[in-house]
Amino acid sequence: MENLPFPLKLLSASSLNAPSSTPWVLDIFLTLVFALGFFFLLLPYLSYFRCDDPPSPSPGKRKCPVGRRRRPRGRMKNHSLRAGRECPRGLQETSDLLSQLQSLLGPHLDKGDFGQLSGPDPPGEVGERAPDGASQSSHEPMEDAAPILSPLASPDPQAKHPQDLASTPSPGPMTTSVSSLSASQPPEPSLPLEHPSPEPPALFPHPPHTPDPLACSPPPPKGFTAPPLRDSTLITPSHCDSVALPLGTVPQSLSPHEDLVASVPAISGLGGSNSHVSASSRWQETARTSCAFNSSVQQDHLSRHPPETYQMEAGSLFLLSSDGQNAVGIQVTETAKVNIWEEKENVGSFTDRMTPEKHLNSLRNLAKSLDAEQDTTNPKPFWNMGENSKQLPGPQKLSDPRLWQESFWKNYSQLFWGLPSLHSESLVANAWVTDRSYTLQSPPFLFNEMSNVCPIQRETTMSPLLFQAQPPSHLGPECQPFISSTPQFRPTPMAQAEAQAHLQSSFPVLSPAFPSLIKNTGVACPASQNKVQALSLPETQHPEWPLLRRQLEGRLALPSRVQKSQDVFSVSTPNLPQESLTSILPENFPVSPELRRQLEQHIKKWIIQHWGNLGRIQESLDLMQLRDESPGTSQAKGKPSPWQSSMSTGESSKEAQKVKFQLERDPCPHLGQILGETPQNLSRDMKSFPRKVLGVTSEESERNLRKPLRSDSGSDLLRCTERTHIENILKAHMGRNLGQTNEGLIPVRVRRSWLAVNQALPVSNTHVKTSNLAAPKSGKACVNTAQVLSFLEPCTQQGLGAHIVRFWAKHRWGLPLRVLKPIQCFKLEKVSSLSLTQLAGPSSATCESGAGSEVEVDMFLRKPPMASLRKQVLTKASDHMPESLLASSPAWKQFQRAPRGIPSWNDHGPLKPPPAGQEGRWPSKPLTYSLTGSTQQSRSLGAQSSKAGETREAVPQCRVPLETCMLANLQATSEDMHGFEAPGTSKSSLHPRVSVSQDPRKLCLMEEVVNEFEPGMATKSETQPQVCAAVVLLPDGQASVVPHASENLVSQVPQGHLQSMPAGNMRASQELHDLMAARRSKLVHEEPRNPNCQGSCKNQRPMFPPIHKSEKSRKPNLEKHEERLEGLRTPQLTPVRKTEDTHQDEGVQLLPSKKQPPSVSHFGGNIKQFFQWIFSKKKSKPAPVTAESQKTVKNRSCVYSSSAEAQGLMTAVGQMLDEKMSLCHARHASKVNQHKQKFQAPVCGFPCNHRHLFYSEHGRILSYAASSQQATLKSQGCPNRDRQIRNQQPLKSVRCNNEQWGLRHPQILHPKKAVSPVSPLQHWPKTSGASSHHHHCPRHCLLWEGI
């Protein structure tokens, strides 16, 4: 009985103290036991019938229906009797149940534990309280006794001493039932007594070194109450005012296991039943499962709240000692970190986190989280041990996070973009995490500076599982670092922070739950913030490291094209011992073995590559030595080459250590002095020794290059001598290339392509020949290309020489000839005071340009022009123009200003200007310069006079192109006589729109046209004796036939108009008048006289009607003008028809040019053609001829007698000239409008819009001799766009212009109503080749408009 549980012990004690116990007491006891067992069996089913009403505010009152729970007393009595009979069997079963419970719970149940739970009450008190409790419980329902043992009740803060579980009475009526437990629960089903709360006491001990996965969170300290969590089933004091057994604070020494064991026997020891074993086992399993579930719920709950929240929640646990509180604080912090990192890891994959953006974000989040948490190496308690729950001040923070941010941004580019190491793509894979090892960072060698992080190797595999196996208390400062480092590396606080940043940003897979480990594993090289030095190790311990550093620096300084050259060129492996190459890196160099091996391979490959380049250079040197026969080689042998000098200066290792290939920082100011004595003026040396700079070295330099290779064989290659030799070779190579590149020379790689040219083309000879080409001294127009380009074939040399000659001649003569003509045009337009005699300047310039064009053609054909050709050209030019004009003409000056070096084919030298006294003299042999461009035209015009024939035969005709006519008559009183414009110029433009080039096809075409019309023109001239003409020597040197009528008309020019003209023009008119007066005595034919000439002379004013610019203005004026001229129809016109019948097949009229200013010298010729047309159309009426003859005689007499009638006619002519000249300029628009209403233009009975006439250039040339003042006035109405078609055939344009010529003179035309046998429709010249069925001029104009 000593070892029985407290209920049985209590019962046994009470039974001993009451010897007079009756059998009914035994029946009651057995009934209670059986009722309790039955209640436990029905308890899972009774949970579904809980009361949903809230508890009443009064402690003993409940509103649940009592009928459901209560049983009748009669049934209870019967049940008690039956239970009394089964009492012996129940006791036996109870003892068996107790033994099974002891076997299941193990050795945790001992007497001491029971004493702590039951209390130190003496047996007397227990015996005294037992009857009271028994009597009191006998009056209460037995079903309501179970909830009083529920451990879910909150502890009473007023209780200060533990009370006995069996002897402590309830403060109020025991009305708490199972239905009261569900008052604050959700409607889902739950386990009543077998389901503990979500925050139960820990079921198992939680030592710091062996955490159990099923362990729940530790309980809070004494004096704390647990606040209700979510999904909680706790009954707080507010929900349950009356509890059966108010529990005090459990002592700290009591473990969770003891608490659980103590509660189970108290429940199961109240009675005996077969179902007790199964109920207790199920309760035990449920407790374990719920504890594990609550642990996961707690972690999930803590992960969704900030650290302050879960610290507060962790503090609300109970039954926690001071050591347990520290352990719980550490565990809660670590759990929160793990949850944070797990959430971050779920965002993306591992490859995404390896990107620089993920590293940056993870590092920022880590810095923020570390700033918010405390230093876990020295954890502080989370709670005070006093009665009041109060949290300590905020946790201690690490160093300023701005330091981390500065260091991170400073090394950000090196962290992520400094890789791959040595800018080699083969090392990309090793920059990140490998399978067996973790590298902090590969050395990010950059071009401009070295990295401040040393390549340290992590030898052990870091895994989160490794740290979970060790308790947090072991992670102290004495923890050994996991990174192997050399003794020379001493971590600094700044370096530690950087190492932490590198670890946390580069390896986010590591759990940050152990910052103390990361803190102790920071290894980095000491570095300054401004200038970072690479590999700052004592050179005394490792003497080969300075050389390695210089090699790495030199490797970094080399351009990228050198590093990638192994893909382009095939390298040849030199015969170097393997030991010398493997000893490039020192043994204790702080890099991983794999990275070390790749670095060595990379350096070997680079050395081999440059060695192969040197071998190729030497092969080219050998090849060039075989061909080295020029004297420049001996001179090159005399002086040391840049390579040789650089080799001599770089032999000592002391100087080699000072050489650093910092090409990026210092491109070249002093590199030539460091790498060798390069010539200061390489361009001068290249001229004298072209092969020295271009790479042709002597045998001595070759020996000096290979000499160190032979001497370094053997044991010396194992030491620093080999490295010095390699450095010298690279230094010489780079210095040589750099010197050539800086001076703009050809690099070594293209030397082979220069060999042939270098041997055959010396630089000095090339310069000499080039200067000779620029200014040749001899007249031989060829270049000796055999000496300059000896490597070419003879045929190629000959063709190249011919091409050079033609090209030179073209560019030497072509541009001046093309520019000369527009220049002359501009100059002549600007000079308005030039006389008519100065118009020969453009003609002479054109002759010279024509001769120059022949010279140019001959030069292109490699035929030097003969001296006779030059003489002929100069003779024609001198005969064509006066010497004074020749000397003063711009063409002559331009010709005299020929630069030196131009080949001269004139043996007599340049022409000299005539003396000043001979400026006004005319040449003895005037040149018959027909502006039509043909000798046949001059012959046809000169058939009227033998003097003209002699002049034509004296000097041959010089053919000039189309532009000659335009330039020759460009400035015939350009500004004063505004009606005279050049054909190639518009009204407001000074620039000619025609080409200034010579075209032989145009010359041939003009000649054919003139030959076609020559017979008719000559016949017509010979068969018209009634027209008197005189050969006049015009001021421009042209012999022209001027009829007498022209003399009269010229003499009729009013004196006022002559006074308004410039002095040069007036002088020209006076000279013309004197010449014509001198020729009157030599007339061959006599003129018939007619007394009716006065009528025709008086009616000369309407003879020059204006040409309006529209047909609408012509139509009304046409009828008026026809009525006005109706009185001119007399029977005296019949002789004209007879004359026309004899010559209608031979008459050829010349075209009047549109924008063409005929000079005064051609005025008589135009009038002659006009009268020829009159007499050819009217053969039946010879009276007008007599009238015209009498008119010319009358006019001639009026000139000398100064009669009033002649003066009036001249005044009228002058007024008409002024009015017509004003039509071509915009500033005389008002005058033009006035004259439009005054004058009319009859157009052969039909309106014809002459604005749409299109002529060819040759038609203009042929009509120039027949152009007159009326033609000029007519051409003013033509548009400027007629120049668009200039190369059309002149046949139809001749006919059309003849019609236009006749339409301009209304005094000889009949009105519409007159029936006259003379009609322009019947008497067109048949030699023109056109049919006579064209009825009116607009039809011909439309024909030419469509051509």
Swiss-Prot record:
Residue ranges of the region described as Disordered: 55-89, 106-235, 373-397, 628-658, 899-955, 1085-1160
Keyword match Protein biosynthesis: no
GO cellular component: membrane
Record's keyword terms, sorted: Differentiation, Membrane, Spermatogenesis, Transmembrane, Transmembrane helix
GO biological process, one term: cell differentiation
Biased composition (Basic and acidic residues): 1108-1127, 1137-1146
Described function: May play a role in spermatogenesis.
UniProt family annotation: Belongs to the SPATA31 family.
Protein's name in the database: Spermatogenesis-associated protein 31A1
Organism: Homo sapiens
Organism classification: Eukaryota, Metazoa, Chordata, Craniata, Vertebrata
Gene name of the record: SPATA31A1
